[in-house]
Design a protein with these regions (language model features):
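Aromatic-rich, lipid-facing transmembrane alpha helices and their immediate juxtamembrane interface loops
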Residues: 1-148
Length: 148
């Protein structure tokens, strides 16, 4: 059975994650080329797909992190330990997704303004996305009384 506090934290995390990933996807879309269609009417559907995938990955990363932490008392105990692991899992997933879609599948490409992490050959923006959006979402979703 899931405690009310856990439900509350998960709802806030998923909601803030969806809003954060929505804003990020819209703002960093110009850093990509080749995946946005010529018709402006298709762009919202592609962005929605990205946001849905990002939100589901954020939930999966947090679930895996809570499990890896081995603490069934989350969010009351081990909140930030699980949060740090969730961010790490998200960054690893982002690196894999960027590599897969840019270099293997060719689903999208980076435009010239996208800064690249040299040793990983992936864009800086998606990596920052998977540090900042989950980090802020975890901060906002934390239970009352938990230290910042």
């Amino acid at each position: 059975m899931i405690s009310e506090k856990r439900r509350f934290a998960l709802r806030r995390y998923i909601t803030s994650s969806a809003f954060g990933h929505s804003a990020w996807e819209i703002l960093h879309a110009p850093l990509y080329r080749g995946w946005m269609p010529g018709l402006i009417s298709e762009t919202p559907l592609l962005l929605a797909r990205c946001v849905i995938i990002d939100t589901l990955l954020a939930l999966a990363a947090l679930s895996l992190a809570v499990w890896l932490t081995g603490n069934s008392g989350w969010p009351d105990a081990g909140y930030w330990a699980a949060g740090g692991r969730a961010i790490a899992v998200g960054v690893v997933l982002a690196i894999f997704a960027e590599w897969l879609n840019v270099y293997l599948l060719g689903t999208w490409n980076y435009s010239s303004p996208m800064p690249i992490v040299p040793f990983l050959n992936v864009g800086v923006s998606p990596l920052l996305q998977w540090v900042l959006v989950p980090g802020l979402s975890l901060w906002w979703a934390r239970p009352k009384g938990l230290p910042d």
